[in-house]
A protein has these predicted regions:
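Selective transmembrane helix interface/packing segments
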Residues: 1-239
Length: 239
């Protein structure tokens, strides 16, 4: 570090707290989700049938509950995880869709974002787990004692690897899709042949539509795996 005559630092990079594109997209997605679910919540408070956007959201909420939460966590424990599962599902889906807009803000293509989501899943899993969860890791029932000593570190390593697998899976799938689309768009300006341009344009359009499906699919996979981790943490001891 260098100082001037008054002992003020001259080569220190100032702390930058400006709002980046990713932060703006996350804030916008959070606001949209708040407004959407506020409408649905108000209809439930007054025992009314959901209207407008609520009609679209209600089947999706039921889908997450009946097809993801209950089968993987169980009816006894799923309710305390529902709010997080719904948040993760709709948040990832929405920011994936925003990444397909002309704004081009690919939030889930940023590994820091997927790391934060995976870290939250990991922390909730560990903090809400039962004693049987750790028993199956460090002292597995039905396994000879010498093997338990060998398998315990492997099981512990598996626990630590899970959030990284969750992080990389979401990041890589979204990033790869955007790279392919941007590469095809770039080829439109490389070729002078109108036939080639038309072919690449059609392929780009097809992949862009396919990305709409991928946006929902990746949200589903992340939520499903999260529910599986929660289910393993609260599983009852059957031995």
């Amino acid at each position: 570090m260098a100082f001037d005559g008054d002992h003020h630092p001259t080569n220190v990079k100032p702390l930058d707290l400006s709002i980046t594109k990713n932060v703006f997209s996350i804030m916008m997605a959070s606001l949209i989700l708040f407004l959407m679910f506020r409408s649905l919540g108000n209809s439930y408070k007054t025992n009314r049938v959901p209207k407008g956007i609520g009609k679209f959201l209600e089947p999706l909420v039921i889908f997450v509950r009946d097809e993801i939460a209950i089968p993987n966590i169980g009816k006894k424990h799923y309710e305390k995880y529902m709010s997080y599962l719904l948040t993760v599902f709709f948040f990832i889906w929405l920011i994936n869709l925003l990444g397909l807009t002309p704004l081009g803000i690919n939030v889930t293509g940023n590994i820091a974002v997927t790391f934060a989501l995976s870290l939250m899943t990991f922390l909730i899993t560990q903090l809400t787990s039962k004693k049987y969860y750790w028993k199956h890791i460090f002292w597995m029932p039905g396994v000879p004692a010498p093997m338990k000593v060998i398998l315990a570190p492997i099981e512990l390593l598996g626990v630590m690897i899970k959030p990284f697998a969750l992080m990389i899976r979401l990041y890589a799938n979204i990033k790869a899709g955007h790279i392919v689309i941007m590469s095809l768009i770039g080829l439109l300006f490389v070729f002078n042949n109108w036939f080639a341009r038309g072919a690449f344009f059609g392929l780009t359009l097809f992949l862009s539509v396919l990305e709409l499906l991928v946006a929902a699919l990746q949200a589903y996979i992340f939520t499903m795996l999260t529910a599986l981790y929660f289910g393993s943490a609260v599983e009852e001891d059957h031995h």
